[in-house]
Amino acid sequence: AHQDLSGKVFVIPMATSTSHVKLHARVSEPISAMTM
């Protein structure tokens, strides 16, 4: 099931040299903007 995550914030509690986020998306148009 798809979920609208617009307006949501994800917090990584501890910054390390190996902290990372994986994004998997199926898009019908190119992504024109993203903030991380």
Swiss-Prot record:
Per its UniProt record, the required cofactor names are: Ca(2+)
Q: How is the cofactor bound?
A: Binds 2 calcium ions per subunit.
A GO molecular-function descriptor: metal ion binding
Compartments in which it is found: Secreted
List the InterPro entries hit by this protein, alphabetically.
Pentraxin-related
Alphabetical UniProt keywords = Amyloid, Calcium, Lectin, Metal-binding, Secreted
Query: Domain Pentraxin (PTX), which positions?
Result: 6-36
GO process terms (BP): protein homooligomerization; response to bacterium; response to lipopolysaccharide
Taxonomy, superkingdom = Eukaryota
GO CC terms in record = extracellular space
Q: How does it assemble?
A: Homopentamer. Discoid arrangement of 5 covalently bound subunits.
The text of the family note is: Belongs to the pentraxin family.
What is the name attached to this protein's record? Serum amyloid P-component
Provide the organism lineage as a comma list.
Eukaryota, Metazoa, Chordata, Craniata, Vertebrata
